[in-house]
Design a protein with these regions (language model features):
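Core segments of cupin and vicinal oxygen chelate
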Residues: 14-58
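A short local loop/turn or secondary-structure capping micro-motif enriched for an aromatic residue
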Residues: 52-53, 59-63, 137-140
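Vicinal oxygen chelate
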Residues: 2-5, 8-17, 45, 65-144
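Short secondary-structure boundary/capping segments
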Residues: 4, 34, 42-43, 67-70, ...
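Alpha-helical elements of the RecA-like P-loop NTPase motor core of helicases
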Residues: 23-24, 88, 129
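N-terminal beta-strand motif that seeds the catalytic metal site of vicinal oxygen chelate
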Residues: 1-21, 77-78, 82, 133-144
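Active-site/binding-pocket entry motifs
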Residues: 58-59, 100
Length: 144
């Protein structure tokens, strides 16, 4: 199934230690719309998916990273698959808002099956986000 086909929205709840800062980030930087909320959680519309920010006390736990293509990919991470042009526009929008990338936008598997562009950055609570796009959306799960 390619990303241009109708899929069901996902629901993901993530921990945040400052709800106000994260709501501001997700709405002001990522362009999310808010849904229901309370003093300790808030629903976000993340590209049509339900992302819920839940307050949790800040911990000193460090994010783990795995080496991929010589880069340190944070684990866990989440994000959205975008159309190629949409990804380019979104990356430029993030740059204009001075987002600090963990991994700058770059192309993986150039000219090969599964060619994709990807980028990583953190929200104010340290949650890692990855946004990516496949040159051919029908190759999302292709092996060769």
């Amino acid at each position: 199934m390619g990303i241009d086909q109708k899929i069901s929205p996902f629901h993901l709840a993530i921990p945040v230690w400052n709800l106000q800062d994260c709501v501001k980030f997700y709405t002001g930087v990522l362009g999310c719309k808010t849904g229901r909320s309370s003093t300790h959680w808030a629903d976000m519309n993340l590209f049509g998916h339900q992302l819920v920010l839940h307050c949790k006390p800040k911990t000193s736990e460090k994010t783990h990273a795995n080496a991929v293509d010589g880069k340190q990919v944070p684990v866990p991470h989440f994000g959205v698959l975008l159309q190629w042009k949409q990804f380019e526009d979104f990356a430029n929008q993030l740059r204009s808002k001075n987002i600090e990338f963990i991994i700058e936008p770059y192309i993986r598997f150039k000219g090969s099956v599964g060619e994709q562009v990807t980028m990583f950055f953190l929200d104010p609570s340290g949650n890692a986000l990855e946004f990516k796009s496949f040159k051919d959306p029908n190759q999302i799960f292709a092996k060769e």
